[in-house]
Amino acid sequence: MLNFGTIGSGWITDEYIHGAKDSGLWNLTAVYSRDALRGKEYAAKHGAKLVFTDLEQFADCKEIDAVYVASPNSMHYAQCKTLLKHGKHVICEKPLCAQADKVRELVKLSQEKGLVFMEAIMFLHQPQLKLLEQAVQSIGAISMVKLDFCQRSSKLDRYLQGELPNIFNPQLETGALMDLGVYCIYPALYLFGKPESFQISTNKMASGADGSGIVTMQYPDKLVTLTYSKLGQAGADSDFQGTDGTIAVASISRLGGIRLLHRDGTAEELHGDDEKYKLMGWEAKDFYRYITQPKESRDEYTKCSELSIAVAELMEEMRHKAGIHFASDSAQ
């Protein structure tokens, strides 16, 4: 069993802690928070014995083997760099960084230190991903793919009332593309590689953040469309349309509700849905395996790192093409 600490106290950290503990491989020992009271309350909630308000001290703690990072996007780079420099394995929530160069730098640093640096993206670590891959191979030539993640933000009402929640604050490197679009980009690149070209259109909010977007990716033999939004709720599946059938996926981010629709009109359910903590538990299990079985998992882990860089590169291109700029871009 390995000991881990956390940065971040939102619902997603709750789910990761639940999943990691449920795996039987991880023990939560420490919590980092800039707010001492909040840190103590969060540690008590989850049974962590140590609380830190100083990042350097947290990173230097010998009772921590690895850290789960779920802070605002704009903080990922500096926090992950500090943790890696102090010899901690790191699993960081998507997206890793707004700029691909920073992702490359962190990957290189982790390699030099002999550490695991991994992006927490549910899609890539679910066992049903193999079912999806097999199904994609079974439906003939694919000409059209629609990947959708439109989910009305729980913070939207606050924004409409005049507040500025983190998710709609571009100073924190957020917005629909960074928060939800990444879940569509990952399967596109994982299954089909980088497109020949793409077009992107976004709906800008008064805060400067993108509230929704549409991307059309051109491949030699297919079109892949990405739709993502934090302003409204989707009512349709993602799907892969082939000459011999269609694969419908109710949740592309969770790989939940996967169905194979045959040409004769019959349907076959390939996978249902899972509780969120179990989905994140698979991330925690792979993270543990990459750390404890480096030789056996090297190829798989290397592919994960390469895909994280490819996703960061494409997302950065998309942002610039759509006119979505962050303050950190000027430092590049």
Regions found by a protein language model. Name each.
Residues 1-46, 324-331:
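N-terminal Rossmann-like dinucleotide-binding module
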Residues 126-196:
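Predominantly a Rossmann-like dinucleotide-binding segment in NAD(P)-dependent oxidoreductases
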Residues 46-109:
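Beta-loop-alpha module in the N-terminal Rossmann-like domain of NAD(P)-dependent dehydrogenases
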Residues 66-68, 286-332:
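C-terminal helix-rich "cap/oligomerization" subdomain common to oxidoreductases
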Residues 13, 52, 92, 117-119, ...:
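Hydrophobic residues in well-ordered beta-strands that form the structural core
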Residues 273-285:
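Active-site loop of classical SDR/Rossmann-like NAD(P)-dependent oxidoreductases
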Residues 184-255, 285-295, 331:
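Contiguous beta-strand/loop segments that form the cofactor/metal-binding neighborhood of enzyme cores
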Residues 104-123, 143-144:
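Rossmann-fold dehydrogenase core element
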